[in-house]
Amino acid sequence: MGDPKRQRKKYETPPHPWIKERLDRERVLMDKYELKNKKELWKHETQLKNFRRRARRLLAARGKQAEIEREQLLSRLKRLGLLPEDAVLDDVLSLTVEDILERRLQTIVYKKGLARTMRQARQLIVHGHIEVNGQIIRSPSYLVLKEEEDKITYARTSPFANPQHPERMMIEKAKQGGEA
């Protein structure tokens, strides 16, 4: 029957390993979004690069098929919450890697106040305490769809589902302290 398809890397490494400006920029993003390693950042940069490459190709292309692909690309990015509903193809070129990092499950769990820190958000996700739309997701890099954003909660099977859980009470207290 043949061999299974070869697994390919989902990221591209930088062309030169020691460019100080890139290293500084990566360090800031790694600290801000509590990424585990550079590979996580490179995956999202490659994703962005591919979106932008497709947009540039489609801007130059003419024809019925190009129009269909334009609509597909725009609808995907709108569903992911990377673009507003009234966006055009030129807006894809202005996306940054931070826009993609803001859509990660880890970031959204932290911003919704389900965790005190980004690191705790990552731990809650990996340990199976967070569910999206009734489904436990264990990948912090999961890109949350716009319609799923309000369906992120503690998992029903998690001890955190109990509002009286001591850690959850500390999270609520930290949330109250941040608002005051």
UniProtKB/Swiss-Prot annotation:
<comment type="similarity">
    <text>Belongs to the universal ribosomal protein uS4 family.</text>
</comment>
<dbReference type="InterPro" id="IPR001912">
    <property type="entry name" value="Ribosomal_uS4_N"/>
</dbReference>
<dbReference type="InterPro" id="IPR036986">
    <property type="entry name" value="S4_RNA-bd_sf"/>
</dbReference>
<dbReference type="GO" id="GO:0019843">
    <property type="term" value="F:rRNA binding"/>
</dbReference>
<dbReference type="InterPro" id="IPR002942">
    <property type="entry name" value="S4_RNA-bd"/>
</dbReference>
<dbReference type="GO" id="GO:0042274">
    <property type="term" value="P:ribosomal small subunit biogenesis"/>
</dbReference>
<dbReference type="GO" id="GO:0006412">
    <property type="term" value="P:translation"/>
</dbReference>
<dbReference type="InterPro" id="IPR005710">
    <property type="entry name" value="Ribosomal_uS4_euk/arc"/>
</dbReference>
<keyword id="KW-0694">RNA-binding</keyword>
<dbReference type="Pfam" id="PF00163">
    <property type="entry name" value="Ribosomal_S4"/>
</dbReference>
<keyword id="KW-0689">Ribosomal protein</keyword>
<keyword id="KW-0687">Ribonucleoprotein</keyword>
<comment type="subunit">
    <text>Part of the 30S ribosomal subunit. Contacts protein S5. The interaction surface between S4 and S5 is involved in control of translational fidelity.</text>
</comment>
<dbReference type="Pfam" id="PF01479">
    <property type="entry name" value="S4"/>
</dbReference>
<dbReference type="GO" id="GO:0003735">
    <property type="term" value="F:structural constituent of ribosome"/>
</dbReference>
<comment type="function">
    <text>With S5 and S12 plays an important role in translational accuracy.</text>
</comment>
<dbReference type="InterPro" id="IPR022802">
    <property type="entry name" value="Ribosomal_uS4_arc"/>
</dbReference>
<dbReference type="InterPro" id="IPR022801">
    <property type="entry name" value="Ribosomal_uS4"/>
</dbReference>
<comment type="function">
    <text>One of the primary rRNA binding proteins, it binds directly to 16S rRNA where it nucleates assembly of the body of the 30S subunit.</text>
</comment>
<dbReference type="GO" id="GO:0015935">
    <property type="term" value="C:small ribosomal subunit"/>
</dbReference>
<dbReference type="InterPro" id="IPR018079">
    <property type="entry name" value="Ribosomal_uS4_CS"/>
</dbReference>
<keyword id="KW-0699">rRNA-binding</keyword>
<feature type="domain" description="S4 RNA-binding">
    <location>
        <begin position="103"/>
        <end position="174"/>
    </location>
</feature>
<protein>
    <recommendedName>
        <fullName>Small ribosomal subunit protein uS4</fullName>
    </recommendedName>
</protein>
